[in-house]
């Protein structure tokens, strides 16, 4: 089921998606909403939407449901890092904010955030860099209110590339895709 709730009211509207996953809700003008999606065996998901300042009340919101399975690795889209850096980029913050919502909607879940580097550089340096990246992601989630007891960070260096190119022949895009963060469910 999927539900919508206006931010300023306690009224909850629930709907079931059709066979294609489509859903519809009547929306009030100039109102903030929180949509919540639940499916057995999957992470609960939510999104915030608003009709404020919109000439049309038709709002399209897609949800990507992840299976809630212990030890399952989920790649976070667009959590990439600049070369030799571990700071959270603005594009990565947007994706980590989605993970914050997911963790808020699933308060019993604990995860490991794992970070990876590309193949350039020495193994020990890359391991240290990936550990800093994973810790940066965890620190970001903690700064948004997720308790540190639910989070673990782990760096894998260049040991688990997502791209199978030979290092010297990898394109810049392939190197970028290897510099990533994923999460694994530790408990549900």
Give a label for each model feature.
Residues 1-10, 91:
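Short, ordered, surface-exposed loop/turn motifs in non-cytosolic proteins
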Residues 6-22:
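Short, acidic Ser/Thr/Gly-rich low-complexity loop/linker segments typical of extracellular
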Residues 59-73:
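Conserved "repeat-terminator" motif of extracellular CCP/Sushi domains
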Residues 81-115, 138-143, 183-188:
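Periplasmic peptidoglycan-binding/anchoring modules of Gram-negative envelope and division proteins
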Residues 114-188:
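Periplasmic OmpA-like peptidoglycan-binding domain that tethers envelope proteins to the cell wall
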């Amino acid at each position: 089921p999927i539900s919508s709730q206006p931010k300023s009211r306690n009224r909850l509207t629930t709907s079931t998606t059709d066979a294609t996953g489509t859903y519809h809700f009547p929306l009030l003008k100039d109102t903030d909403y929180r949509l919540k999606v639940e499916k057995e065996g999957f992470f609960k998901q939510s999104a915030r939407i608003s009709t404020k300042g919109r000439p049309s009340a038709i709002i399209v919101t897609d949800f990507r449901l992840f299976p809630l399975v212990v030890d399952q690795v989920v790649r976070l889209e667009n959590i990439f890092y600049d070369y030799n850096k571990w700071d959270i980029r603005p594009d990565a913050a947007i994706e980590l904010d989605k993970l914050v919502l997911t963790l808020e909607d699933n308060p019993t879940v604990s995860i490991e955030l794992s970070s990876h580097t590309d193949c350039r550089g020495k193994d020990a340096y890359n391991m240290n860099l990936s550990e800093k990246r994973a810790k940066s992601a965890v620190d970001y989630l903690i700064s948004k209110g997720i308790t540190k007891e639910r989070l673990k960070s782990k760096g894998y260096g260049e040991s688990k590339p997502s791209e199978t190119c030979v290092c010297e022949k990898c394109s810049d895009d392939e190197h970028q895709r290897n510099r990533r963060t994923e999460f694994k469910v530790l408990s549900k």
